[in-house]
A protein has these predicted regions:
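Internal, well-folded beta-alpha domain core
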Residues: 27, 86-243
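Hydrophobic, proline/glycine-rich low-complexity stretches
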Residues: 1-71, 201, 206, 213, ...
């Protein structure tokens, strides 16, 4: 494979035709460093783990989805807005495109879950979820409903800290992702996105109880995360699928 494209705080390739728009709000990034060999079998054929300083990472990302829109139409205020928590890995394809691979995506609106599973072929799951804010503290809870294993979930509380004026290389590596990879019939599919540079804050992890990582095929990931970040969010545009 060619070397990965450079890490950039904004998209290296503009999205020329908008297929979906989304707002990502109150985003928490929890990440654990892991051996690339441990997660390589979980990635789509035609991709390999993306690595920084010899390690790849597993992410647990709770946030609020806001007003999904289709083909430039205004975002949907109810069906397009919901809580979400995803488990993701970091990937590179044969074109050097860096991306993420979702192992699971919990959401508390059933219709978007069904649509994403059918249209985008993404592993969305229906869950009971809450997001609560109390000053600089945010708490995210999730309990899976369908499909199983039922009851897999998470309880995460963080305290938001100071703004990062210059994010370090690890923060850029974990957040500046300009597409996702998923399996396809003829090799990996790449779904590009574009958004402004992330406004990132330090964050302190106050509570973490979760079983989503093990349910996503990552039973060996445990302990305190190596990185805890927060962002108030960005507005995102997705282009058409690419090969």
């Amino acid at each position: 494979m060619p070397p990965p494209e450079p890490l950039t705080p904004t998209a290296p390739r503009p999205v020329r035709r908008t297929v979906f728009t989304q707002g990502w709000r109150d985003v928490v990034f929890l990440h654990w460093a892991v051996d690339p060999a441990a997660v390589a079998p979980l990635l789509p054929a035609g991709t390999v783990p993306d690595v920084l300083d010899g390690a790849t990472h597993v992410g647990l990302i709770p946030f609020r989805m806001r007003r999904i829109g289709v083909l430039g139409a205004p975002g949907l205020p109810y069906l397009g807005s919901f809580a979400e928590t995803n488990v993701r890995l970091y990937s590179v394809d044969e074109h050097g495109r860096r991306g993420v691979v979702f192992r699971s995506l919990e959401a508390d609106r059933l219709l978007p879950v069904l649509a994403a599973r059918w249209v985008a072929r993404l592993p969305y799951l229906w869950a009971r979820m809450t997001v609560r804010r109390d000053g600089d503290r945010l708490t995210y809870t999730s309990s899976r409903r369908w499909p199983g294993p039922p009851g897999a979930g998470s309880h995460i509380t963080v305290r938001v800290g100071e703004r990062l004026t210059t994010p370090d290389p690890l923060a850029v590596f974990l957040t500046a992702r300009w597409g996702l990879h998923r399996p396809g019939a003829h090799g990996p599919v790449f779904w590009p996105n574009e958004h402004p540079e992330w406004p990132l804050h330090r964050a302190e992890l106050l509570e973490l109880h979760e079983s989503l990582l093990a349910a996503a095929g990552l039973p060996g990931v445990s302990g305190r995360p190596a990185s805890v970040l927060f962002s108030p969010g960005v507005d995102v545009r997705f282009g058409p699928f690419e090969r």
